[in-house]
Amino acid sequence: MSATLSLLASVVMVAAEKDYTKYVDPFIGADGGGYVFCGACVPFGMVKLGPDCNNLTENAGWQAGTDIMGFSHTHLNGSGGGCKYGNVLFMASTGDLDPNDYASPYSSEKAEVGMFSVNLDRWNVSARLSASAHAGFHEYTFPESDNSNIFVDLGKFLASIEMQEFVGSEVTILSDHEIQGYTRVRNGWNYSKAYTVYFYADFDRAADSFGTWKEGRKEPGRRCQSDNNTKSGAWFSYRTNAGDKIRVKVGISYMGYNKARENAMELKTWNIEDTRAQAVGAWNDILSQVDVESGDEDRKKIFYSSMYRIFLQPSDYNGENPVWKTDSPYYGDYHAIWDTFRATHPFINLIRPTTGGEMVQSLVDIYENDKYMPDARSSHSTGRTQGGSNCDMLVADAFVKGIRNVDYEKALDAMIKDATVPPGDDERQYGRGGLPDYNRLGYVSTDYERGCSRTFEYSANDYAIAVLAKGLGRTDVYNEYVRKASNWKNLWNPGISSFGFSGFAWPRNSDGTWLDDPEFTVFSSGSFDHQFYETFSWELSFYVPHDVNALIDKMGGREKFIDRLDTYFRESFPGKRDELLFYTKLVGLCQISNEPCFLVPSMYAYVNQPFKTAEIVRRILDTQYTSARDGVPGNDDSGSMGAWYAFHCLGFYPNAGQDVYLISSPVFPKTVIRMEDGKELTIVAKNTSDKN
């Protein structure tokens, strides 16, 4: 059994005494660019059942102020960019069903742990949703009507920029209370191969009439629409009295119909409150591992909501791998490790190390069966790689934290392949792009996209390889990669100045000359086709997490380093606003709405000034995070923003891949962290306040 499903007796006892889920608001971050998933799910659940407001929303499905299109069973949390998922969409209506026009305005929406509810105003129908790991529970309350409908639209999916593409679907009405089918989709943000989501739906009431449709053309009484690359759906209709409830259990699977039916059986009763209670119990098992004492109820709400989001992804796909047979743990929806290696996975490793180890082992298994460990992976396809081979950071972090349920010898093989074997034409999907330059020149030149940011990330990745190699007694590998971990110095240009400081990360041509472009500045930023991926030189120049002492020397010594940090958090951004991708949440030059800055506030610890870290962190916590629906400063990115907040509330922050936590100031007067092995860490912050 996977650790995700295991229970700790000591934690269960605590959970029974206190309901931590009452402090969780799944709507925090759903608006304002946080793209937080607000529907129903269990920790790491494969099913994430929630509303899709239109097919052009982001990955979480929710978009305030638009109509609800329906409720689909697959989502990601907090991810920007092109959409994935939004598969197997169910909806309810009244009157004559039009498969091309059924979206509804909504009201009275409410998101709670294990439950999402909303009124569909167009149809005078209320919906309640809950979920287990592999199944969704729907409950619809109807008005008096001769035609109350529940239907599934297999042609729907989320389809914003970098669009997913429809491939095919099939639907069959098995009886007057059962429907099964599948939808097949490809592409999206990770340019995935086609993936198939099967479903089996069981209704608690026999339909009075039924039918199917193909490409929007209804065929009443027809039981099946076969797959010929067309969009299909099916409906059940009922005569209802006011207040009648109809319930549906929907199991999904990536393996086939039998597994989908088996997964539906996770829902043992027809009482949605039972499903909700099981979800609440699963969440309390996790949330109770961090017990905070505080009279600040709003802060507790933000904290536990942040912690909740850490455990939404990656998704536990054990037993649901359609690509290869494996006895290894199998997790997916790493979206993306470039975001999550910094805080999300270290937090999981802190309180659920067995699960953290399973995740790392799943990455090793992916390497053995699909070329490389992924930087991102969803719908059982790898891609895309945003920067470095940052699985290396996850492996090193698990190793130095003493997590042992990982085959580290194979993990080291995977890391070395990252560092030595170019991915060829698949540079945005696999491995390290620009690797021939990096290994020949010691940096990725301007001949390749993202050359500067890749070089700095590869240097940190190489240090992670060295850490593991040393731990495994591979001295030769350690010596090679600890040397390569200094390659960032090859892109340190002492001739670049800003705000009175000299020496910054800077792109370099393959002939050794520096990039000379008057339009390119220390504030220039971009995406995949830029030299700085979602960062800029002022920020990237701090990214030497593995050798801060050498960085301090490059910046001119201790006092200059302190001055530069002070300036980074004090000065206003002087560049053109459109140069910065994620400028909406700036603290000085620090774009806390994006991950490359995550470690910087804690770097004062390396010059013995943690009090400045405490001041900066508290300012960010107080001004950039709230309990409102737009209360997350940027894309939550699989819990990354939540993990940054949660760690700093505890008063320490990880330097991922190292056995180091950097100290700041705890927010709560007392915190008890209950470890998986039964040990407890108690943090007491005497006289803590907004000013202390």
Regions found by a protein language model. Name each.
Residues N461:
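ATP-dependent phospho-/nucleotidyl transfer catalytic cores
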Residues A15-H345, N349-M393, F399-F456, A464, ...:
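Accessory carbohydrate-recognition regions in carbohydrate-active enzymes
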Residues S2-S10:
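Bacterial N-terminal signal peptides
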